[in-house]
Amino acid sequence: KPIWICWLDGIENAPLLVQKCVSSIKKNAANHPVNIITQDNYAEFVTLPEYIIEKKEKGLMGAAHFSDVLRVCLLAQYGGLWLDATIYCKGKIPEDYFENDFFTCKSEPSDVGCISRNQWTTFCLGGTKDCILFQILRNFFFEYWKNEDFAIDYLFFDDIIEVARECVPEINHLIEAVSYNNLERDCLIQRF
């Protein structure tokens, strides 16, 4: 199953920190192919509606939200593991991340000021290509951007997951089934 990373300008044009993070992912990917998605190659992997491409080109959709659309399209079509380009892997990526219908970073629920309450992250999402969550997210993004010219919230990806979790019992079950993992992923936040 593939690993997906996106840096629209190409890794060679990314800041050194991003280059080191991507290098760490490649080093720890085991036998999983690592696909770097860029502005120049995304169409080799997914076909997007023309209205989304136009909104990106006109500046109505920023890079982060365009990346969100790419993320759910890639996972819906191929499955695998999406890792943001700013994730640094200090060890081998565990094989069990690829073995379940759905995977995300998850820890003890808390009121951390975000809607996910540590039950999922959008910077690390994985699963099978037929995962209902990715299908619903893709369809939502397509419909939303067909009718809107701006994102209502920078983190509305999380809002959509929460609505899907509340409305579709199967999605809630997928999220609940993920074991706590990567419990030290936010430790640097506490230092700064």
Over which residues does each language-model region extend?
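Glycosyltransferase-associated regions of secretory-pathway enzymes
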Residues: 1-67, 85-192
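Small-residue hinge/turn detector
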Residues: 69-78
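Active-site acidic Asp-centered loop
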Residues: 78, 83-85
